[in-house]
């Protein structure tokens, strides 16, 4: 699925899950979102839940074709975003991981390595040039964990928002979007409402 001419959706749908984070009923499943930005350099945005490693890696390979990704941007360290960082780096050892300093510290605890020799640490205002696309990074602590960054693609005017603007439900199910987005907001990020409001009002 192409989001724009250069941005491809490579996430997966989970129809086996019944409780998200062990407490929120998700009768229509969940989607774990990941994207490929196809430019002079290829950036992969986030990974997916560990139960979908092979499907996701197949999606990455299909999106990249004969090429290999140059960057993996890890915006959030919750497992539904980061569980396949190690698997990705095993397949693409020449790729660089782009993430916040706090996220790399968490990787050492989660995975036993912080990928020091393949790490690009980014902070508020940093940019990554892919060619036509420039990614700008915005610090978004506590949306939903303290290490979170979100990423803005100025070429296509697309915000990759981590947990900030999510919803419950798999993407291959027809349902009322607003209802599940509202339920997700109040269940997952409502306690950080001020930070979400600040994030959405950024220029």
Question: How should these model regions be labeled?
Answer:
Residues 2-64, 150-153, 157-161:
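Conserved beta-strand hairpin/beta-sheet module of binuclear metal-dependent hydrolase folds
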Residues 2-5, 99-203:
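Metallo-beta-lactamase
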Residues 40, 51-98:
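Active-site metal-binding motif and surrounding structural segment of the metallo-beta-lactamase
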Residues 40-41, 68-69, 93-94, 116-117, ...:
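Short coil/turn connectors at secondary-structure junctions
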Residues 43-46, 70-74, 136-137:
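Short catalytic-loop micro-motif centered on adjacent basic/acidic residues
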Residues 77-82, 104-106, 144-145, 166-169:
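Active-site environment of divalent metal-dependent phosphoester hydrolases
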Residues 87, 109-112, 170-174:
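Short acidic, glycine/serine/threonine-rich loops at helix termini
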